[in-house]
Structures are given as C-alpha cells and as structure tokens.
Amino acid sequence: PGAKGTGDVAIRNFDKWRDVRVNMDTLVEKKQISTDFELFGKEFSAPIFAGPIGAVRMHYSDEYDDRSFNKVLIKACNEAGIAAFTGDGMDDDQMVSGCEAVKEADGHGIPTIKPWNLEMIKKKIELTKEANAFAVAMDIDAAGLPFLKNFTPPAGSKSVEQLREIVELLDVPFIVKGIMTPKAALKAKEAGASAIVV
C-alpha cells in the first residue's frame, strides 16, 4: 500500500540505496565484528527492525491474516535478536492481534498506533500497556491516508502540543515513525519523542 502520490517512492528508495557504499577500514584491532547495540535498555543483534504492517490479507497475501502474521513476525524477529513494529488500521483486530503477539513475547515488540483522534489513541495505548510493550510508536506519515483524513472525529496530522499529550500518556519510550524533514524531527524532539524513524 506504499508509494502514494506519484507511485515511484519504492523505486527512488531502491535507487538511493544502490548509491550507499560501505567504506572498509582495515586499520583496526583484529577482533570479531559486532553489530550488537542497545536501545531503551534492551540489547539487539543489529540496528534493523521490521516495520509495521497491517491489513496483511488485503494488501499482501491470503496466506496470513493480521493475527497469524504478527505471531510469525514477532517470533522470527525475536529469534534473530531484533524487534518488530506491529501495525494498526481500521480493523480493530490489527492492533489487538499485534499487541497480543507482543504480550506473548514478554513485551518484546513495538505496537504502532495510527494518528487517530485522542480518544482512540488512549484506547490503543491501553492495549500496548496490557502487552507490556517496551516502546510504542506512531506512524505519523499515515496522516495523509484518505481513511484518516476523512475520519470522524478528525484524525491525522498532530501539532507538537498534541504529540506531547500522547507522549505524556505513556510510561515507555515513544517513537515517531514517518519523519520526512529536519524540521519535523525537531518538532518530534520538542514533543518528547524518544526516537524517530525517517
């Protein structure tokens, strides 16, 4: 469901990734290379996390529904030593099943909430708390999706003050996914976000 607008986002991203080169430096102490890192007090095997996906059957395949996909995703990421973000959407079961999978993994996953109205966000935050998630995210770039723009009560983009109010509802780190500009990154920081995903 990505590549909105001109439809070339995935292609342009692929082209840009082809420009990235690893610069090898052999003037270092000879030892085992490690990609391990720590985030929010947890250890991970690599700085690579699986992104949030919802409405799996509608967008991708009949092989999985949201519930079975989230279970497989969370389990596989945990076995690989990384974490997964889980998705959200119009169907409440998307968020519920993601949080259930995170709970089954002892909170090792990051439920991702769409930028709904505050009352819906509060309900979804309660699900993340029941799941004992170690962090919670919001995919703020979803604000442009037609179903959010036309939602009643209003949903979508958030001001710094609105984002801060959401941060204050949480007792775990809050990640803002879908930051597109340096200015937006500074706004997320001002609101109290613990991290961003560009």
PLM features: residue spans?
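A gly/proline- and charged-residue-enriched helix-loop-helix capping module
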Residues: 68-117
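Active-site cofactor/substrate anionic-group-binding motifs, chiefly glycine-
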Residues: 39-88
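An N-cap/entry alpha-helix motif that binds or orients negatively charged groups
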Residues: 1-44
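General beta-strand structural signal in soluble alpha/beta enzymes
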Residues: 29, 86-87, 111, 137, ...
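Alpha/beta enzyme core
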Residues: 64, 74-75, 103-105, 115-198
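Short glycine-enriched loops at secondary-structure junctions
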Residues: 55-56, 88-92, 141, 182
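Short alpha-helical segments and helix-capping/turn motifs at coil-helix boundaries
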Residues: 32-37, 96, 120-126
